[in-house]
Amino acid sequence: MAATSYMTPPSGDLDMALGGGGYHTSSPRSAADAGEMKYMQHHHHHHAAAAAAAHHQLPSSPSPNGQGNGGGLGLGSGSGLGSWSALHPDPWMQTHHTHHLPAAAAVASAADTVKQEMSHLSQQTRIQQGMASPHAAWHAPHAGHYAPTGGSPLQYHHAMNGMLHHPAHAVAAAHHQSVAPLHHTLRGESPQLHIHHHMGGGDRDAISGGEEDTPTSDDLEAFAKQFKQRRIKLGFTQADVGLALGTLYGNVFSQTTICRFEALQLSFKNMCKLKPLLQKWLEEADSTTGSPTSIDKIAAQGRKRKKRTSIEVSVKGALEQHFHKQPKPSAQEITSLADSLQLEKEVVRVWFCNRRQKEKRMTPPNTLGGDMMDGMPPGHMHHGGYHPHHDMHGSPMGTHSHSHSPPMLSPQNMQSSAVAAHQLAAH
């Protein structure tokens, strides 16, 4: 067997290699490093020095013994060490020549197997993702992250180190890593959710397209402004429009409703209901402008307002005197009074109605009630009250109640009344 020699590096270099940041792994970093370590089998003695120098330049670490006994070597700046073999016989280096080739072959075969399995599973994952979702391109970056080529060198280095000592564990770890895209896909949203998510916008568009008949707030605002301008230009009042709608379409609207529509003060639902009616009225009014139509006649009737009645001071004084005598005259009294004052019966009736409303506004109700109570005699308030003993004979409340106020039922009385009612219902 060819001899293996080692060069003795300076003590400072050994300190840097062992304690100052050297590698602390007990195996080569990768399969490529394992192949480079073949320099240890020298067939010519004149290559020993160069091979030993190259050995110290490799990133691979010394043997496990060097890792465990680094602190016990006591290497310092003044120590004169000969060689590694002189200080510590390394069984790892002695047996390296015997098992190096089988280990390299196992590493190569395991690496090929792992790469084949990972590529096969990655291809299956991409096919499944492409069949499951129309947006498989969105998942490609996630799947590619677990591809063999996308892994970091450090992960590959740890995988190779594990294969040297535990090939079965390394294959299982690689298999688990290759299956990771499937778990990532399961953790994500399902294809149905993706399809529903991306089709949601289309569904909303379809729904909104089916509800095109419902106007928006902007449409209502624009129509209200246009309607008001056209109505004023045509010469119709808001009361005319409300009366015309009632005559034409059967829905009578007041002047206040039309005013609130133009001012956008109605609810959105009522605005939507009123808009088509006003639009039809506006179209008919535009088409029949200049010719006397039913709308014009209705508008003319609406514009016919009665002239405000003016009553002379003497007549008003007579009505006031009669009002103090009788605030609510009968029909015969109204007729006789109208004849005596030479007024229409309807004018007299309306005047009395307005006068009564004015009296209510001028007189607070509490004052009127207080005056009435003050005017009553003291005994009248008590004897004019409610006497329950007149109509409570035979009742559970007793027959000798002398209270002049409505009886207040206590819980005991309510319970007894309920028991009596239950007994009567049972019989």
Swiss-Prot record:
Tissue specificity note: Coexpressed with acj6 in overlapping subsets of neurons in the embryonic epidermis and central nervous system. First detected in the precursor of the tracheal pits and the stomodeal invagination and later in the peripheral nervous system.
Locations listed in the record: Nucleus
Cross-referenced PROSITE patterns: HOMEOBOX_1, HOMEOBOX_2, POU_1, POU_2, POU_3
Protein's name according to its UniProt entry: POU domain protein CF1A
Coiled coil regions in record: none
Biased composition (Low complexity): 49-66
GO cellular component assignments: nucleus
GO biological process, one term: dendrite morphogenesis
Domain POU-specific span(s) in chain numbering: 212-286
Keyword Transcription in record: yes
Function of the molecule: Binds to a DNA sequence element required for the expression of the dopa decarboxylase gene (Ddc) in specific dopaminergic neurons. Could also play an early role in specific ectodermal cells, and a subsequent role in the embryonic nervous system.
Region ranges (Disordered): 39-77, 196-217, 288-309, 390-427
